[in-house]
Amino acid sequence: MLQLLATGGNGGAQESYTGLLLRLDRSAYEVRALSLSSGSAVQRLRRLGLEVAVIDEADDDAAVRELTAYLVRNEIDLLHAHMYRAEVIGARAAVAAGTAVVMATVHSSRVRSAEDVAALAALTPVMDRLIVPSASILAKVRAEGRGAASFSVIPNGVDLARFDLPLTACALRREFGIPGGAPLLGVVARLEPEKGQRYLIEAMPAILRGAPETWLVIVGEGSQEAELKSLAGSLPQPVASRIVFTGRREDVAAVTGEIDVAVLPSVREAQGISILEAMARRKPVVASAVGGIPEVLTNGLDGLLVPPADPVALAEACIRLACSPDLRARMGEAGRATVEARFSLDAMVRHIEEIYDEELVRAGALPPSAAPRLVHVIDQPAGRAVLEIPPL
């Protein structure tokens, strides 16, 4: 099979793609990985010892030709595309190559142009299965004219063992001069408009009025970095000095372990892998009630949901948690239980493997009698060691 990624840059889709590649059962499948561009995600996969081919071709028709040749040359039976361009290029190439099974995961809640929506709708009849991470994304995709597709809702999952490892000393607080006992808010996300960091920055003056010792770390990189830093710098002291931009980090599990409250102030979100990671680390979450987030968080149990683009509501929720260590602990334990029950990486991969086998049998590429033995759940499979996956 081929796992096809649209872009080798950073984001939640690449995080899900990486987890899937690391956990797929190599005794059942010959797995290949290919990205339609190079970037930090490709570099990370290679550092983890995975072979990743790259077709770095900006022209779509040329990319289709190269991918078609790759599919034929490597006798690919199943193509699983991740992200928009991979779905478009992958579907066209798979049809040309006669690939038995064509699937895609719709990772993004992005609002598509009319042209993009039309292109995806036109390709939907050749897709054997579409996977979505949440019911909200399912509704969105159906509304875009793809309702005739065969869908499976499979939530993103996180590697629980990775977040069970003892805290390593990433020295985040010492690195940035953050006092050890100060409540620390943290947002781990691409610095893009849809992630809503600006609303959390705007909330910081009110947060410090209600919880004067609070600090905020903003982890990630992206197109809004300069604008967000300028916004933070325009705030009065001591507020401005309490907002720290860390850039891209290679120790996301350790960073998550050092924060006290995880915040995701997105204005749209497919699901929110970073909040799953925080919950796996037993951290309470404040997040916008958008997209798939309410399907993850139960307000008042394992986190606090707030309206999107609302600095006042963000401030109130953050103050409530910053001022109550006991509440943070209770919500953190509840969040861990939620992830264990519904959002583990092994469960995600198991469900996807079941779909692979079902579709391969349907296409005649796998004998029906072989499918049951190819799907098995192992707590710590051989060859799937717990790895510290660097952040995107």
Predicted regions and their residues:
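Aromatic "clamp/platform" in nucleotide-sugar-dependent glycosyltransferases that forms part
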Residues: 248, 267
